Swiss-Prot record:
<feature type="binding site">
    <location>
        <position position="140"/>
    </location>
    <ligand>
        <name>deamido-NAD(+)</name>
    </ligand>
</feature>
<dbReference type="InterPro" id="IPR014729">
    <property type="entry name" value="Rossmann-like_a/b/a_fold"/>
</dbReference>
<comment type="subunit">
    <text>Homodimer.</text>
</comment>
<feature type="binding site">
    <location>
        <position position="173"/>
    </location>
    <ligand>
        <name>deamido-NAD(+)</name>
    </ligand>
</feature>
<keyword id="KW-0436">Ligase</keyword>
<feature type="binding site">
    <location>
        <begin position="260"/>
        <end position="261"/>
    </location>
    <ligand>
        <name>deamido-NAD(+)</name>
    </ligand>
</feature>
<feature type="binding site">
    <location>
        <begin position="46"/>
        <end position="53"/>
    </location>
    <ligand>
        <name>ATP</name>
    </ligand>
</feature>
<keyword id="KW-0547">Nucleotide-binding</keyword>
<dbReference type="InterPro" id="IPR022310">
    <property type="entry name" value="NAD/GMP_synthase"/>
</dbReference>
<keyword id="KW-0460">Magnesium</keyword>
<feature type="binding site">
    <location>
        <position position="189"/>
    </location>
    <ligand>
        <name>ATP</name>
    </ligand>
</feature>
<feature type="binding site">
    <location>
        <position position="180"/>
    </location>
    <ligand>
        <name>deamido-NAD(+)</name>
    </ligand>
</feature>
<dbReference type="GO" id="GO:0009435">
    <property type="term" value="P:NAD biosynthetic process"/>
</dbReference>
<feature type="binding site">
    <location>
        <position position="52"/>
    </location>
    <ligand>
        <name>Mg(2+)</name>
    </ligand>
</feature>
<feature type="binding site">
    <location>
        <position position="160"/>
    </location>
    <ligand>
        <name>ATP</name>
    </ligand>
</feature>
<protein>
    <recommendedName>
        <fullName>NH(3)-dependent NAD(+) synthetase</fullName>
        <ecNumber>6.3.1.5</ecNumber>
    </recommendedName>
</protein>
<comment type="similarity">
    <text>Belongs to the NAD synthetase family.</text>
</comment>
Amino acid sequence: MEIRKRILADMQVAETIDAHEEIRKSVEFLKAYLKKNTFLKSFVLGISGGQDSTLTGKLAQLAISEMRDETGDNEYQFFAVSLPYGTQLDESDRQDALNFMNPDNRLTVNIKASVDASVAALAEAGVELSDFAKGNEKARERMKVQYAIAAMHKGVVVGTDHSAEAVTGFYTKYGDGGTDINPLFRLNKRQGKALLKELGCPEHLYLKKPTADLEDNKPALPDEVALGVTYDQIDDYLEGKEVPADAAAKIENWFIKTEHKRHMAITIFDDFWK
């Protein structure tokens, strides 16, 4: 039980929430960051068409719109970036998500040429990437592009990581995990759905099965299959509810196994890994 106490303390998930209050909490958090760092003028976010980027994008646009209204400074902008590898299977969902969040700016950068070039260069050097490793290349290329856009617009990269994802470390280190600010952390998956429902999001965007969709050989592989545990079980665990012993063990194993992802590069003074 000690490990669960630690996880619950780290993940900060409330047993119940008020969706409207949590929306305002995230928006005010994003605005406060811009107000504190007055040299920053934009948010940049990669949009997949899934629940997490849809919610994060809507919150980011709300924050930017309010900053413009409050300051009269039209330099405040939100950049929603589509980053397909070739053709995305659920492109229609991404377009629905973009229409829902109505971002100031829509950009599309196809990462296929860049990823394939990296894979080919590594192969030429004698390093043949597995399909899984190539999937991580895609995630890191997407983040590289977002930071390039942010650099040109006085921006920061907004992350989609929430507590149900953070507890399992279900993201690529220095890929989708390598962001500047994460307005969803403290929420689990079902709570994110509640916020989207409150915001009037089309329900198919938050009822679809979550997938990282990184592997060529396993297209649209559901997160729950990859993790071996359901989001309902993860959410129950984070809310302090009873879950099957095998599910709890899997969640705790993921937490321990991926702890390095929740830290910057370790130094001689760090002891979490010992």
